[in-house]
Curated annotation (Swiss-Prot):
Gene, per the UniProt record: Gnb3
Name of the protein: Guanine nucleotide-binding protein G(I)/G(S)/G(T) subunit beta-3
Record note on quaternary structure: G proteins are composed of 3 units, alpha, beta and gamma. Interacts with RASD2.
Any one GO MF annotation of this record: GTPase binding
Function: Guanine nucleotide-binding proteins (G proteins) are involved as a modulator or transducer in various transmembrane signaling systems. The beta and gamma chains are required for the GTPase activity, for replacement of GDP by GTP, and for G protein-effector interaction.
Key words of the record: Repeat, Transducer, WD repeat
Family: Belongs to the WD repeat G protein beta family.
InterPro entries: G-protein_beta_WD-40_rep, Gprotein_B, Guanine_nucleotide-bd_bsu, WD40/YVTN_repeat-like_dom_sf, WD40_repeat_CS, WD40_repeat_dom_sf, WD40_rpt
Native species: Mus musculus (Mouse)
WD repeat copies, ranges: 53-83, 95-125, 141-170, 182-212, 224-254, 268-298, 310-340
Record keyword Repeat present: yes
GO CC terms: cell body; dendrite; heterotrimeric G-protein complex
Length: 340
């Protein structure tokens, strides 16, 4: 047996010891805890709005904090800001690169950002004096594609990249303040905690990591998926996270218990997950799939309680409004749908 093999076995044994130690700390399972709870009734949601205007696949969307406006990014090379009440386009921003993979709305509503295969994060000012939307910053230092970006405020944004790193940027100077290193595969997704002090990332190494924005350190690593993690989100209270993977499952991890609580999957679901988001209470989990559907899960009972079907192609992105009143899905069929 080679030295490499010996070390590999040793590492596996240590991993098992850690898993056993974590299990020993758990005083109760989620299933036991909610055994007396009724399952949420059938969740039937209707399409209230269809946003038409993109001419190609939609890759990303993000709600503004006002729960009215949203930004979407498409392969047609446009970033569109929509008024979801009227379905009007507030801004249609032509991009320098049409290979866009992510977009984000600043909490203030003043800026939007996007990026993709150009390896850059472009910041657009929606409130410029001239009234026209133009690039205010291009943040370039990543050596791989930009997979996700999220604002902390008007001067700070966090990005994840195919170069396996995440980064915190000072938008004013255009410089990286902190680089978050630790993943061993392409970083696919990130989400910021409700208090903006932490963020989580999911990667192609099948792990999720919790990072401290100020300290620049990795606090926790969560494993369990058998394939790439494509999507990640915080539970509304910030004390748990959910991941969506190509292994056809979503998983719920508790930050305080430092371990997986449950998985959301069914034998009939064999395709990957592209996007995840919780309802305002956290009781419902919305997950977008490659099979054109969005499944609604009871997050506590781990049962599927609804399906949002209305797209003719992969559901690539979704999001729940800050006020919890609506969920938006975006698809490769070039449409966005607003449900409630």
């Amino acid at each position: 047996m080679g030295e490499m093999e010996q070390l590999r076995q040793e590492a596996e044994q240590l991993k098992k010891q850690i898993a056993d130690a974590r299990k020993a700390c758990a005083d109760i399972t989620l299933a036991e805890l909610v055994s007396g709870l009724e399952v949420v009734g059938r969740v039937q949601m209707r399409t209230r709005r269809t946003l038409r205007g993109h001419l190609a696949k939609i890759y990303a969307m993000h709600w503004a904090t006002d729960s009215k406006l949203l930004v979407s990014a498409s392969q047609d090379g446009k970033l569109i800001v929509w008024d979801t009440y009227t379905t009007n386009k507030v801004h249609a921003i032509p991009l320098r690169s049409s290979w866009v993979m992510t977009c984000a709305y600043a909490p203030s509503g003043n800026f939007v950002a996007c990026g993709g295969l150009d390896n850059m994060c472009s910041i657009y000012n929606l409130k410029s004096r001239e009234g026209n939307v133009k690039v205010s910053r291009e943040l370039s230092a990543h050596t791989g594609y930009l997979s996700c970006c999220r604002f902390l405020d008007d001067n700070n944004i966090v990005t994840s990249s195919g170069d396996t790193t995440c980064a915190l940027w000072d938008i004013e100077t255009g410089q990286q303040k902190t680089v978050f290193v630790g993943h061993t595969g392409d970083c696919m997704s990130l989400a910021v905690s409700p208090d903006y002090k932490l963020f989580i990332s999911g990667a192609c190494d099948a792990s999720a990591k919790l990072w401290d924005v100020r300290e620049g350190t990795c606090r926790q690593t969560f494993t369990g998926h058998e394939s790439d993690i494509n999507a990640i989100c915080f539970f509304p209270n910030g004390e748990a996270i959910c991941t969506g993977s190509d292994d056809a499952s979503c998983r719920l991890f508790d930050l305080r218990a430092d371990q997986e609580l449950t998985a959301y999957s069914q034998e009939s679901i064999i395709c990957g997950i592209t996007s995840v988001a919780f309802s305002l209470s956290g009781r419902l989990l919305f997950a977008g799939y490659d099979d054109f559907n969005c499944n609604v899960w009871d997050s506590l009972k781990c049962e599927r309680v609804g399906i949002l079907s209305g797209h003719d192609n992969r559901v690539s992105c979704l999001g729940v409004t800050a006020d919890g009143m609506a969920v938006a899905t975006g698809s490769w069929d070039s449409f966005l749908k607003i449900w409630n």
